[in-house]
């Protein structure tokens, strides 16, 4: 299956021909992806809203998880 979006041949993290991450890349896009690497754990990826605290990267994924109250 696809590891990344093949739509843009200019993405330095994704091989547009195969839809696979390029060698050494952890991710191609996402709020917790920076220059083909996962952002460090606890990096803020979404600013606090109302009573909810900031959402932070896990260091293991390009996705920005919603705060779960734990």
Curated annotation (Swiss-Prot):
GO molecular function terms attached to this record: toxin activity
Localization terms from the record: Secreted
Motif Cell attachment site, residue range(s) on this chain: 49-51
Family of this protein: Belongs to the venom metalloproteinase (M12B) family. P-II subfamily. P-IIa sub-subfamily.
Entry comment describing in which tissues the protein is expressed: Expressed by the venom gland.
Protein name (record): Disintegrin triflavin
Note: The disintegrin belongs to the medium disintegrin subfamily.
All residue ranges annotated as the Disintegrin domain in the record: 1-70
Any one of the GO CC terms: extracellular region
Function in brief: Inhibits fibrinogen interaction with platelets. Acts by binding to alpha-IIb/beta-3 (ITGA2B/ITGB3) on the platelet surface and inhibits aggregation induced by ADP, thrombin, platelet-activating factor and collagen.
Lineage summary: Eukaryota, Metazoa, Chordata, Craniata, Vertebrata
Keywords of this entry: Cell adhesion impairing toxin, Disulfide bond, Hemostasis impairing toxin, Platelet aggregation inhibiting toxin, Secreted, Toxin
Summary of subunit composition and partner proteins: Monomer.
The keyword Signal is assigned to this record: no
InterPro entries: Disintegrin_CS, Disintegrin_dom, Disintegrin_dom_sf
Principal subcellular localisation of the protein: secreted
Listed transmembrane segments: none
SMART domains membership: DISIN
């Amino acid at each position: 299956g696809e590891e990344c979006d093949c739509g843009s041949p200019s993405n330095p993290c994704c091989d547009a021909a195969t839809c696979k991450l390029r060698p050494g890349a952890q991710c191609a896009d996402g709020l917790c992806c920076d220059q083909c690497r996962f952002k460090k754990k606890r990096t803020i990826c979404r600013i606090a809203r109302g009573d909810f605290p900031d959402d932070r990267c896990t260091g293991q994924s390009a996705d920005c998880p919603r705060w779960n109250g734990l």
